Amino acid sequence: MQLRSSLRLALLALVLLALARPATAVAEDAPFVGWSSLLPGLTLPYDVDSPNDCIAGRVQCVDQVIRQMTMRFKPLASSCDHDAIFALTYLRVTEEYRRTVETPTFFDDTSFVNHEDVLFARYYFAAYDAWAAGRTASVPPAWRVAFDAARDRAVSANGNLLLGINAHVQRDLPFVLYSVGLVRPDGTSRKPDHDRVNQILNRVTDDVIAEVARRFDPTIDDTNLPTTLDDLVLFQTIASWRETAWRHAELLAQAPTPQARDVVAHEIENYAESQARGIRMATQYLPLTGGRAARDAYCATHWAS
């Protein structure tokens, strides 16, 4: 009962965090790093006529991403690594995205969104690979908080999920959006397609939570109320983060100089990290509750179900 109460409080804390003022520095004397100078290494050109499926934004490249996500997820699942929670979630979201684009009219510019989807995944892969290789200086702070919490088995499955989403949406997504561009060649905004992704996220939320509960941690859905209120809170939190990511991408695009863009990038890093630290605090296992051990024991016999 104590664990259930803590998870409910975690959801409340996340709502408050989502309403916090964007891009607030973690500390006045935080070291300055020119993060925007790192962007060229993770860009991907876009050309619909390219023979390269990923550059052209063909759906075959999305299939490649799903295969890579599956390959990465399997060892995390079989070892009951706490990073498996976000890896599974991201895989299921991408699979639903793949099914969605079978309807060619869902997005205004499907090829472009395919291209963005692939680049977005590469940010996650790059962060995880750098962390796994011990190159922590190359890992964005929000991701370090997420990966460290998983390594230390410090937070609930709910915490692992939200730490991963926070790092990928509030940290990575602004840079991805800025990199690919916020407007079409005719000058119209790409935001309608950005917002349509929320429909995909809304469709998969319940099923993902149910699968995590079945395979890894049955307590992740202990907050479920007789209504769908808690699922609505979770989805609206993610939608709010995606809106913040778009606004932060606009700030990157509007920066008048590279130096000004570095300042915006630094604030994005600090904001995502501060959110991550708040999530970790709100979802950490309480001493002597046995939640961590019970979760790992459950996973050991259910991860393949």
Feature map (PLM): residue ranges:
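Bacterial N-terminal signal peptides that target proteins for export
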Residues: 1-10
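Hydrophobic helical h-region of N-terminal Sec-dependent signal peptides
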Residues: 11-16
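C-terminal segment of classical bacterial N-terminal signal peptides
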Residues: 17-24
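Long acidic/polar interaction regions in large eukaryotic complex-forming proteins
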Residues: 33-35, 40, 90-184
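Charge-rich, solvent-exposed alpha-helical interaction surfaces
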Residues: 65-68, 72, 89-92, 96, ...
